[in-house]
């Protein structure tokens, strides 16, 4: 006689109850084991925020014979080359103190820190002009200082890091900056576009659209992080998304993409609801190189793409020729897009660039 079953008439009913209980427990344990065995697969492209010039792309264009002016015109649409005001001093926050550095001296200490000195001269010259322009337009610290000496703005390592080739690129472009409508145009840059750059309003949500910072195809960007992938167990994914998952983790649903198409917004799916997140927060939580990413789930039944409601991809604007150099100094910075400060949520910056890219 089964314990708790006091009569023959109740024996069958009791056995059924126990069988049902055992079945429920077994199914629950199986479901838990299945969830823990599921894997979140992430396939992505690029390294950085994707807005403006890709350093690996500039390298590729230079290797294909493009001039620095053509490279800059490709990434910063409708721009021209102008001349910076004379005797410009860049205010750099060094520790707790602000140091004033002459513009050309500052740029020499940046270019050698941002890209490899072995790159073709056109790529180094494009970097020099972009970095010089960024120094004039960033205003990271308001009126107190202009730039940080690191990836929050752009890398600056000073005279000790200078090289003959990068100094030659700075000298060859002395005073030259990127302008739009006769004013300095903020020149964001980063390591690798993944094959397409991003429009500023999608790369930095909350920023106003700018006509020179639009997404363009980038076929000559062939850096080491043009394509990458990551896999995480569901338990590891949930741990990284701590505070965002309601109930048990079920996956990611992308709601909106930019033109590249980097993620603008997505939902973290849980058994008890969903949580809206930005693409940059999602990249930061997972430690991704870029917000250009696609998600799928692999389990015992196979691999399943995550549900997605994506923005339509837009065709890139037509290529534009390099603009002529103007000899007159230009005035205040154009546009209204402030330089976003701090990290981008990936191992790169949101200001200028996130360190030297391999190539």
Predicted regions, residues:
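Conserved, single-site charged/polar hotspot
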Residues: 2-359
């Amino acid at each position: 006689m089964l314990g708790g079953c006091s009569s023959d008439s109740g024996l069958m009913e009791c056995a059924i109850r126990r069988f049902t209980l055992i079945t429920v427990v077994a199914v629950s344990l199986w479901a838990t084991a299945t969830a823990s065995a599921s894997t979140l697969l992430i396939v992505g492209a690029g390294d950085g925020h994707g807005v403006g010039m890709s350093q690996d792309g500039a390298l590729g264009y230079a290797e294909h014979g493009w001039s620095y002016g053509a490279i800059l015109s490709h990434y910063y649409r409708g721009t021209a080359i102008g001349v910076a005001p004379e005797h410009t001093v860049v205010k750099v926050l060094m520790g707790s103190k602000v140091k004033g550095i002459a513009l050309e001296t500052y740029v020499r200490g940046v270019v050698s820190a941002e890209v490899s000195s072995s790159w073709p001269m056109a790529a180094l010259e494009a970097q020099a002009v972009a970095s010089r322009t960024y120094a004039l337009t960033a205003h990271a610290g308001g009126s107190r200082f202009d730039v940080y000496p690191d990836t929050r703005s752009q890398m600056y390592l000073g005279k000790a890091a200078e090289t003959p080739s990068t100094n030659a690129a700075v000298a060859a472009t002395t005073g030259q900056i990127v302008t739009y409508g006769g004013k300095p145009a903020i020149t964001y840059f980063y390591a690798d576009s993944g094959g397409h750059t991003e429009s500023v309003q999608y790369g930095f949500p909350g920023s106003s659209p700018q006509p020179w910072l639009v997404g363009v195809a980038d076929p000559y960007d062939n850096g080491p992080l043009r394509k990458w992938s990551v896999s995480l167990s569901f338990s590891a994914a949930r741990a990284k998304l701590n505070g965002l998952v309601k109930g048990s983790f079920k996956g990611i649903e992308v709601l909106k993409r930019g033109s590249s198409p980097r993620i603008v917004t997505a939902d973290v799916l849980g058994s008890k609801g969903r949580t809206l997140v930005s693409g940059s927060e999602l990249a930061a939580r997972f430690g991704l190189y870029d917000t250009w990413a696609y998600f799928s789930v692999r389990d015992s039944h196979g691999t399943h793409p995550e549900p997605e409601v994506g923005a339509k991809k837009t065709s890139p604007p037509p290529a534009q020729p390099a603009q002529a150099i103007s000899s007159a100094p230009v005035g205040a910075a154009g546009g209204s897009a402030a330089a976003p400060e701090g990290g981008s949520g990936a191992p790169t910056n949101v200001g200028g660039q996130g360190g030297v890219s391999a190539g």
